[in-house]
Amino acid sequence: MKTSINYLPEQKRDDLRRIVECVLEVLPDCEMIILYGSYARNTYVDYDQRIEYGIRTCFMSDYDILVVTSTRFQRYIINHILSKATDNYYKGKNRYASTTVQFIDESIDDLNKAIDKNRYFYTDIKREGIMLYNSGRYKLARRRKLNYREIKELAEEYYNDRFERANDFLRNAMYDKNDERYKICSFHLHQACENYYNSIILTFTLYSPKEHLSLIHISEPTD
């Protein structure tokens, strides 16, 4: 895994170093801190404003950070700990003008199981991510070739998740149509189509294309 962030501007490098400090201050159990997503791929967007489906939107890429621990924490505990890290990171910053940090967390055992089972989200992180901190006490697993039963189980899991998500968007679109909110209806229809499409892609390939931009503001629909 890569370790250098020298391709990023100095301010971004300072932000990431501060994020590492903030996590380690509140989480002694931390084993690895990994930058993934658009900042790891150097495809990030600092700020972009556009109009999509009649809605004015502003986009800013997040710092996507995977925190790996030796312990499997209960969800509310690790969320509380990482909230402290987030608050400490924003001290002295204009929170609304700063790049947002988004944490996800996994225990080293769960992360290695996910990599071993070829879960694309985690294998992509291993392939494209940047190791910001490593205690040196653990190693990441290697993905392996799955047998037919494992492939079938994973395909069914992905299909059910994405297809139901698409159904939710479609239901929202129908509500919007009934309320004559046609612009937001078109947005929900687009999301439904995208998830129906991805449910097919995931079922047959066990992989989904990357798309990660954070919506930081939605104003009223434009005329």
Task: Name every feature range the model reports, one short phrase each.
Residues 2-26, 46, 52-115:
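Metal-dependent nucleotidyltransferase catalytic core
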Residues 2-11, 88-171:
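Conserved NTP/Mg2+-binding pocket subregion across the NTase superfamily
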Residues 214-223:
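Residue-level detector of conserved catalytic or cofactor/ligand-binding positions
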Residues 31-45, 49-52:
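Short gly/ser-rich loop at a beta-strand->alpha-helix junction or flexible surface loop bordering the NTP-binding
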Residues 185-207:
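Hydrophobic alpha-helical packing segments in soluble, helical-rich domains
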